[in-house]
């Protein structure tokens, strides 16, 4: 009996040790992503010709599939300049970029050999549009992400054609051909471009078993050991991907990313002028940073490959702000609870520098509460101006920290969002109790 107990204990120790090693390996693999904070999403495809919803327009019967595909004839990419795109993206402060290699319409933007439906073979663009972009991103030290739709409403072996029409309901031979097709395209992308990240979409229509999600994830990591996968592969991904709506509380997954459009459309739509302001975009980025996540901000180029002027303006102002405040963005971790400061915050990795984001012109001193640490220094991020502070309500007999009042001169304010850095005497130590009554004087 004693031998059995020892054997079980030793097996548990080995298992725990193995699990810890896997956890450390995952942490190391995900570090660049957790540090990045900002990525740029690109939805580019034939839907930009008419300026209609990508893929969904024919799936929802707003336009026939035949008329949707006629857009291939107008997709020229005649002014596409991958170097300019990459330079603009790097200049925005983004550390990675994700481009649609194929949306739900099945039209590939690279020279796939797995079928004939690509802009290379079927449109005036007539060339691989992914290859030059990947090269230019790497020249600019920007990580490469590839978007890939698992479902394909144009493929003859995919079950669903539109919301109302199915090609078939149960045909294992056709389904297996389609799964093989997905594996074929993803092997091409993996071996040709060696992406740092895959951004899957469309997994909701089938189960993990039908997609062969486990085998697919293993294959992708076999072709490219360190590739990161998003969550949309039926539970086999590395990070969560809330969409459009800003999370009010932090997602459960340690690693997460909000994907969001600049206006109301993923792809280029000439009638959509409802753009967010640079200030709104910056504040959403800050909210993501505050909760320990990333922002993947979308742009939608035109059919000729030019990026709309409104989108360029937003990216450039975003770049000005991120460049100025880099220390309070990249490599930071989630901030302190709102009870301590009425605004978003972040911490450096060591946890001894607290960043306060100031989105408005203060009408008095900033207020910081419940910090048990000694404050060594305060400064304005981006210009280095040292700040004065005052502590009130600190009693010698009480463990409750005093309230810190911080004076921020108007001359140091950024036109979008100001950031204050506070150097503490060690890792941030928060008072989270309910106050104290005097017992002795």
Model-identified regions with their sequence ranges:
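Mature catalytic domains of secreted/periplasmic carbohydrate-active enzymes
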Residues: 20-441
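Bacterial Sec-dependent N-terminal signal peptides
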Residues: 1-22
């Amino acid at each position: 009996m004693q031998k059995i107990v020892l054997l079980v204990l030793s097996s548990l120790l080995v298992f725990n040790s193995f699990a810890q090693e896997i956890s450390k390996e995952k942490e190391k693999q995900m570090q660049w992503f957790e540090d990045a904070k900002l990525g740029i999403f690109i939805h580019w495809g034939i839907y930009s010709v008419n300026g209609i919803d990508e893929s969904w327009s024919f799936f929802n019967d707003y336009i026939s599939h035949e008329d949707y595909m006629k857009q291939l004839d107008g997709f020229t990419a005649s002014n596409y300049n991958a170097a300019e795109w990459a330079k603009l993206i790097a200049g925005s402060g983004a550390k990675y970029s994700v481009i649609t290699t194929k949306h739900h319409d099945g039209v590939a933007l690279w020279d796939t050999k797995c079928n004939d439906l690509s802009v290379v073979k079927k449109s005036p663009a007539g060339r691989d549009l992914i290859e030059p972009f990947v090269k230019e991103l790497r020249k600019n030290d920007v990580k490469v992400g590839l978007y890939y739709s698992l479902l394909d409403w144009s493929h003859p072996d995919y079950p669903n054609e539109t919301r109302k029409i199915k090609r078939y309901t149960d045909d294992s031979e056709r389904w297996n051909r389609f799964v093989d097709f997905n594996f074929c395209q993803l092997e091409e992308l993996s071996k040709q471009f060696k992406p740092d990240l895959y951004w899957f979409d469309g997994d909701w229509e089938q189960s993990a078993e039908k997609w062969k999600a486990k085998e697919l994830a293993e294959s992708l990591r076999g072709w490219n050991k360190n590739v990161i996968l998003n969550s949309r592969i039926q539970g086999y991904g590395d990070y969560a991907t809330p969409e459009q709506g800003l999370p009010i509380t932090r997602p459960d997954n340690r690693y997460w990313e909000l994907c969001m459009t600049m206006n109301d459309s993923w792809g280029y739509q000439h009638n959509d002028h409802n753009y967010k302001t640079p200030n709104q975009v910056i504040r959403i980025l800050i909210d993501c940073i505050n909760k320990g996540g990333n922002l993947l901000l979308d742009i939608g180029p035109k059919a000729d490959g030019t990026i709309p002027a409104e989108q360029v303006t937003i990216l450039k102002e975003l770049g000005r702000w991120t460049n100025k405040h880099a220390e309070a963005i990249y490599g930071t971790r989630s901030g302190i609870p709102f009870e301590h400061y009425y605004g978003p915050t972040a911490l450096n990795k060591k946890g001894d520098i607290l960043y306060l984001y100031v989105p408005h012109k203060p009408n008095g001193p900033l207020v910081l509460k419940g910090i048990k640490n000694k404050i060594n220094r305060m400064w304005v991020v981006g210009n280095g101006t040292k700040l004065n502070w005052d502590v009130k309500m600190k009693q010698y007999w009480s463990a409750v920290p005093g309230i810190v009042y911080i004076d921020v001169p108007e001359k140091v304010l950024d036109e979008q969002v100001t950031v204050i850095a506070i150097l503490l005497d060690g890792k941030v130590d928060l008072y989270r109790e309910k106050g104290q009554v005097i017992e002795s004087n």
